[in-house]
Amino acid sequence: MAALLLLSSAARVGVAAPLALRQQRPVVLPGGQLRTGSGAGAASAWAARPLRPELAAVSRPAVPARGRAPLFRPRAWMASSQIASSAFTWGTIAVLPFYTLMVVAPNADVTKRAVDSSAPYVALGILYAYLLYLSWTPDTLRAMFASKYWLPELTGIVRMFASEMTVASAWIHLLAVDLFAARQVYHDGIKNNIETRHSVSLCLLFCPIGIATHVLTKVLAGSIGRSH
């Protein structure tokens, strides 16, 4: 009888052992972690344990962004500060030959042809539009017209000019307007035989003063001519 009991208990142990081993078979998790255990309790306990950050980052596949990348990405070529600095420098250099011709040789044919050309204004206009595109933000109009009457306010303009790109675009705007004003002064001087060298020079950096100087010069020249 005792022998039969021993055999039956051994048979139960022999059957239970493979079952336990099958239930405790390790499972490979994403990221290389192993999970062992048996039953629902072990599965829930392991499910509650998060993966280590470095393994979780490896196990998650990257999701590609939808849509195509833009073909024209100027910011990838140069930094914003480099673009603003280059535009500021080259824009200034581009207008200097026209001022030099109007001051050094106002009556030369090459000066008249150069001043009559529209090329510098087209080039400055394209450069200005490019810088304006780079500096534009959703808050640009709100900063410009911060008043409830939709009028510009000084505080909003000051905030706008905190950006180098905005300053560069404003400088190109001034260069184009100043050169156009200097051309008008030059043409008026040629037409009325009035000296314009000093007025054209002032138009480069102090355009309103240059225009006022030309008007004053024209008045003085007219009064002197009438006296003679």
From Swiss-Prot:
Subcellular localization(s) per the UniProt record: Plastid, Chloroplast envelope; Plastid, Chloroplast membrane
Membrane spanning stretches: 77-97, 112-132, 154-174, 195-215
Location of the transit peptide in the chain: 1-41
Disruption phenotype: Mutant etiolated seedlings display reduced ethylene-response in roots and enhanced ethylene-response in coleoptiles. Mature mutant plants have increased shoot length, branches and adventitious roots at high node position on the shoot and impaired grain filling.
Main location group: plastid
Conditions for induction: Induced by ethylene in roots.
Tissue: In etiolated seedlings, expressed in roots, coleoptiles and vascular tissues of roots. In root apexes, expressed in quiescent center (QC) and root caps. In field-grown plants, expressed in leaf blades, young stem nodes and the base of axillary buds and adventitious roots derived from the nodes. In reproductive organs, expressed in anthers and pistil of young flowers, lemma of mature flowers and parts of developing grains.
GO cellular component, one term: chloroplast envelope
GO term, biological process aspect, one: xanthophyll biosynthetic process
Swiss-Prot/TrEMBL keywords: Chloroplast, Membrane, Plastid, Transit peptide, Transmembrane, Transmembrane helix
Extra remark: 'Mao huzi' means cat whiskers in Chinese.
Function field: Required for neoxanthin biosynthesis, an intermediary step in abscisic acid (ABA) biosynthesis. Involved in an ABA pathway that acts at or downstream of ethylene receptors and positively regulates root ethylene response. In coleoptiles the MHZ4-dependent ABA pathway acts at or upstream of EIN2 to negatively regulate coleoptile ethylene response.
Record-given protein name: Protein MAO HUZI 4, chloroplastic
